[in-house]
Amino acid sequence: MDSGDFSPMQSNFSLGFMSFEDIPEDARTTEMIDKIVFEEDKEYDHTQDSFRYGRVTTGVSYNLVTGKIPKTVFEQVKAKDDENDNVEFEMEHLEDKETAHKTQTFDELYESQMPKYFDYQSNFSDVNGIWTLLFDQNHYEKMSTFELQAAICAALNSKHFMMICVGIDAFNAVTGVEMSAKDRVVFRMALTRAVAGEFQPPLVKVAPKQLTGVSPMKRDISEVTSSIDVLFVPVIGVTDEVENNRFLIVVRVKEISDKVYQISSGRIYNEQEGRVVEMSDMNEAFHKLIVEKSISDIQTRRGSMFMLEPEPFLEDSAVIFTESNEIPSENHEISRVHVKNCTERSLSQSLLNLLDIQNIGWIFFGTALSFCIYNNAIKPLVK
């Protein structure tokens, strides 16, 4: 998918508030169900798992519904993965206290404003402090991992918390997306793939088989990084005879990073006026993301970024300013004479200040010494 296709329905920095309500019994078990990757081959054929392979270092984009990639690309990335299976698993940033504090800040913003479930066609209010991208349910079938990568890259480079919400129409009504348990598993694996293999510097350092092997926990992005995850928030009240299987998809970026990120294709993204914008090159990225972001106080833009020069001021001025801006014409000549005299006095006073008593003594001593040398040495020779 081309970068020009990335056009979320809505994008905003939120301002609103939504209160919690009691969680229905079905909703309480949703998270546990989503963690399950089917172990029986009849329900889920692991041999057809496109996410088992494909450490996406060649710009591959998965479809979020089918989880498929082109066969030719599949063989290439599979061969590359077999070479990289000995990569050690690293999650140092999970132990970083500063990262944990930032994640906690996001969790506080999210939990205080987002409900545990939504009523069908209810209004989606803004969320304060979190950049929010909204997509409708029709866009879900066309979405690819590229759109997730571009938005995540923009959020990280712009130092924003972010939510990508899929299942909200043009009127901000929550419709959700119809998803089976298998669909949710495929989406989780797609997000894990998008985050684990596409970013430079890497967001997750992990070998492909460790990431997408038999263990179901390794298929959830929240198990390998604390900065990004996905939630499936239940949407209830749909008048269908079938069981309730509508969810609002919420992809969350919970960490603010000081690094500059790009995806494997070399593209760099940034947030501008609530939109995901591709930057032209790395030079532009460093200029906008480092120089401009480091100058947080707008006042510093008025002068040197290294030193702020003081404002002009008057000290011991000979001219007395009055509240009136008009000076009578008969006083003009007097003012000029007064200013001239004050200027001459100031110059002479400045010279005297430079010459203290000690300096005057040395001047007299030098003059006397020069006179003696002239009389005793130079004058007899001239005669």
Curated annotation (Swiss-Prot):
Cysteines paired by S-S bonds = none
Topology relative to the membrane, per the entry? Answer: Single-pass membrane protein
Q: Where in the cell is it found?
A: Mitochondrion membrane
Q: Which residues form a coiled coil?
A: none
- Region annotation SLFN-like fold: where it falls in the sequence: 118-266
Q: What is known of its domains?
A: The transmembrane domain is mediating the localization to mitochondria. The proximity to mitochondria plays an important role in piRNA production.
| UniProt-recorded name of the protein | Schlafen-like protein 3
Lineage here is: Eukaryota, Metazoa, Ecdysozoa, Nematoda, Chromadorea
